[in-house]
């Protein structure tokens, strides 16, 4: 038995027939010696952040941010590419997404929710950090260092200039990871104790906030439209590029069934000396896959596949598997030369933003 109680706090105010139905279900489960689970969900007035279940069960449930496809119903835009940009800005945190107005453009949402005086989400990043840590300055510095995209330990250390040794970064990264604000990844071909790790902000909205909104809070000169045009627009594609690869990895993990016949049972990336592969893993069918992601630039012709082949040869991940799929994820319509090169190979595919979003490509 699984009982899901949405807005569980209303149960005590409900009519007796509601509590009677719940009681009868529990009695039946107990009589039949069945395992039963009770899942409760309740509205919170907190503007953003982790929601803790207060009750007698003694459990805490941390809900991850929504994936790109799961967040689509809340994102403004008219094309798949628009939706990728919107996800790169507002991410997948439900308490953020509920404030987004789908009837206006992404730029208008950015101004209204993040840049205008008393904007609803302007202090969201502060609220998340400052209720869990007493001295947030270095935590802000770490998150700001990661806001420009996934990076390594040394780069994070350089972003916190008052720390004299790289080892001093550890407690801040570990605390942020424990709070669910930072994620750590290893290359799929690395051992569990490998120090070759990369760190990223856990949700695109938090990265966007630390990259663009926090500096605005510290310097409010100029109006919101000027800041949007001068500070955000020129760097928005760079920011979205960092998010696009994660969207591609999400697709392989959760939504590849309709294209490749199964989702990935292992999904991540590969990097090392002489190779960098944005999306890689093993499908449920046992086939290995390797893909690179192109948001800003358009891949051209067969040389794009050749470069991917060379990167695959530089590591042994998936070596010996009967089928090894090459994938090119592109945010723009692929040129004819690339389509021809892919069509000549049985183990190569092109995935556009429409497929990632579960709709027709542009």
Write out the residue ranges for each language-model feature.
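Walker B catalytic acidic pair
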Residues: 6-8
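Accessory nucleic acid-recognition modules appended to NTPase machines
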Residues: 102, 108-276
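Sensor-1/coupling segment of RecA-like P-loop NTPase cores
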Residues: 10-53
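Conserved small helical "lid"/interfacial subdomain of P-loop NTPases
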Residues: 59-84
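The conserved phosphate-sensing helix
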Residues: 80-99
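A cross-kingdom feature that marks ATP-driven nucleic-acid transaction machinery
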Residues: 202-362
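Conserved nucleotide-binding/hydrolysis micro-motifs of P-loop NTPases
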Residues: 10, 43-48, 66-69, 94, ...
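N-terminal positioning helix adjacent to the helix-turn-helix/winged-helix DNA-binding module
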Residues: 53, 82, 134-138
């Amino acid at each position: 038995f699984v009982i899901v109680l949405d807005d569980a706090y209303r149960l005590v105010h409900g009519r007796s027939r509601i509590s009677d139905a719940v009681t009868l279900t529990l009695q039946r489960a107990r009589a039949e010696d069945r395992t039963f689970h009770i899942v409760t969900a309740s509205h919170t007035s907190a503007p953003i952040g982790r929601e803790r279940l207060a009750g007698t069960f003694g459990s805490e449930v941390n809900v991850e941010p929504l994936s790109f496809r799961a967040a689509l119903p809340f994102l403004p835009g008219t094309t798949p590419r628009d939706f990728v940009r919107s996800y790169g800005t507002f991410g997948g945190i439900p308490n953020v997404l509920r404030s987004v107005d789908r009837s206006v453009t992404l730029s208008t949402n950015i101004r209204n929710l993040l840049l205008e005086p008393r904007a609803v989400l302007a202090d969201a990043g502060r609220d998340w950090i400052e209720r869990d840590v007493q001295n947030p300055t270095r935590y802000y510095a770490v998150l700001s260092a990661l806001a420009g995209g996934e990076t390594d330990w040394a780069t994070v250390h350089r972003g916190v200039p008052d720390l004299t040794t790289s080892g001093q970064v550890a407690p801040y990264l570990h605390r942020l990871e424990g709070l669910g604000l930072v994620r750590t990844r290893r290359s799929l071909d690395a051992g569990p104790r490998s120090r070759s790790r990369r760190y990223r902000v856990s949700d695109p909205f938090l990265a966007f906030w630390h990259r663009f909104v926090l500096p605005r809070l510290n310097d409010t000169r100029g109006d919101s439209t000027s800041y949007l045009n001068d500070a955000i627009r020129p760097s928005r594609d760079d920011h979205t590029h960092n998010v696009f690869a994660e969207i591609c990895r999400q697709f392989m993990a959760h939504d590849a069934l309709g294209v490749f016949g199964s989702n990935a049972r292992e999904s991540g990336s590969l990097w090392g000396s002489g190779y960098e592969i944005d999306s890689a893993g093993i499908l449920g069918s046992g086939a290995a896959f390797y893909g690179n992601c192109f948001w800003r630039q358009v891949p051209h012709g067969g040389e794009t596949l050749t470069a991917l082949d060379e990167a695959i040869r530089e590591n042994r991940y998936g070596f010996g598997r009967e089928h090894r799929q090459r994938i090119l994820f592109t945010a723009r319509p692929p040129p004819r030369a690339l389509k021809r090169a892919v069509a000549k190979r049985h183990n190569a595919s092109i995935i556009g933003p429409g497929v990632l979003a579960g709709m027709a490509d542009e």
